Amino acid sequence: MIIKPRVRGFICVTAHPTGCEANVKKQIDYVTTEGPIANGPKRVLVIGASTGYGLAARITAAFGCGADTLGVFFERPGEEGKPGTSGWYNSAAFHKFAAQKGLYAKSINGDAFSDEIKQLTIDAIKQDLGQVDQVIYSLASPRRTHPKTGEVFNSALKPIGNAVNLRGLDTDKEVIKESVLQPATQSEIDSTVAVMGGEDWQMWIDALLDAGVLAEGAQTTAFTYLGEKITHDIYWNGSIGAAKKDLDQKVLAIRESLAAHGGGDARVSVLKAVVTQASSAIPMMPLYLSLLFKVMKEKGTHEGCIEQVYSLYKDSLCGDSPHMDQEGRLRADYKELDPEVQNQVQQLWDQVTNDNIYQLTDFVGYKSEFLNLFGFGIDGVDYDADVNPDVKIPNLIQG
């Protein structure tokens, strides 16, 4: 079939297998060009391995550190007449390139929040790797079914305490949109913490430790975003922020148990704002990102997922002098938080109107990166060619 982008709101409901493969190849080429990372992990579990930062971590571990990788994700395959998800095609491409390099790659498709998928993962580690020495936690999901109670939690993107006047960019109509976001109820805050907080990360590490599949000295990190004051009302001070603060609490207990396990470590890693399927769903982020891209590109400091994660590995996860803040988080977002960058974004924020969107922002760059996520708009791909949407992932365990 011939696959074209079909965008509905903040999601593209189609994905292009050849484009997704080219996108993965581009990230692998970046890591290969930057060179090997010393003292890297050799057996890595990536929870949330198919898109965005999780995919970038899997690529960096494999092609930067020479690691065998086991990936967990929840994606949909293509079938006749219907494309699969971009994460499915990304993972198929990753497996293909890892095999060419002689690297072990196995993936598990299912709900990472469930006990069943945790057990399948443990079984795969025991059978193939023995143990893992690094666990990357990079789940982005709007809902979670609690494995012990069966209760279904849905996350909410809302402020806490007071309603917030929100400036945003309607990416469909390409106009500036002013709206009022009502504050979250306590129940919505609790649900968001249940979905996006640290409980599941802790459950994973506890399960892996109990099963004896974490190597002594193993490290784990969960990815997060903090941002600056422009995004704080909806982000750090909002319901998502409550979940992020829960990560900061849960990491302390995880760190303690890993430290006792042969001197291991657990850290929250703070990464910059990038275009992902998760970030495009957050009100105000498309406008913020369009402005941030413009300012950072002009300064020559613009980075995407792979640049961020490669430097996180090289400098902090595997380096001797990690970028760490007072709370003990690893920081890779310092170029975004450069006061000069934030001041310029803040000034432009108030000046943007429908008439000057294309002059004051890099909305063109935002749209391009958004389509790239789904394998569209990639140089060298023939989008008029007939492609088979049914792409198999070798070494896939279906949960």
From Swiss-Prot:
Recorded E.C. number(s)?
A: 1.3.1.9
State the pathway, as annotated in the record: Lipid metabolism; fatty acid biosynthesis
Descriptive protein name: Enoyl-[acyl-carrier-protein] reductase [NADH]
Q: Which UniProt keywords apply?
A: Fatty acid biosynthesis, Fatty acid metabolism, Lipid biosynthesis, Lipid metabolism, NAD, Oxidoreductase
* UniProt key word Lipid metabolism: yes
- Activity control: Inhibited by 2-pyridone derivatives such as PT172 and PT173.
Per UniProt, substrate binds at 225
State the function annotated in the UniProt record. Answer: Involved in the final reduction of the elongation cycle of fatty acid synthesis (FAS II). Catalyzes the reduction of a carbon-carbon double bond in an enoyl moiety that is covalently linked to an acyl carrier protein (ACP).
Query: Which family, according to UniProt?
Result: Belongs to the TER reductase family.
UniProt catalytic activity: a 2,3-saturated acyl-[ACP] + NAD(+) = a (2E)-enoyl-[ACP] + NADH + H(+)
| Record-level Gene Ontology MF annotations | enoyl-[acyl-carrier-protein] reductase (NADH) activity; NAD binding; trans-2-enoyl-CoA reductase (NADH) activity
Spell out the residues of the site Plays an important role in discriminating NADH against NADPH. Answer: 75
UniProt xrefs under Pfam families:
Eno-Rase_FAD_bd, Eno-Rase_NADH_b, Enoyl_reductase
Q: Its quaternary structure?
A: Monomer.
Biological processes, Gene Ontology terms: fatty acid biosynthetic process
Active-site residues per Swiss-Prot or TrEMBL entry: 235
Q: Where does NAD(+) bind?
A: 48-53, 74-75, 111-112, 139-140, 244, 274-276
Keyword Cell cycle present in the record's keywords: the answer is no
> Which InterPro entries does the annotation name?
Eno_Rdtase_FAD-bd_dom, Enoyl-CoA_Rdtase_cat_dom, FabV-like_NADH_b, Trans-2-enoyl-CoA_reductase
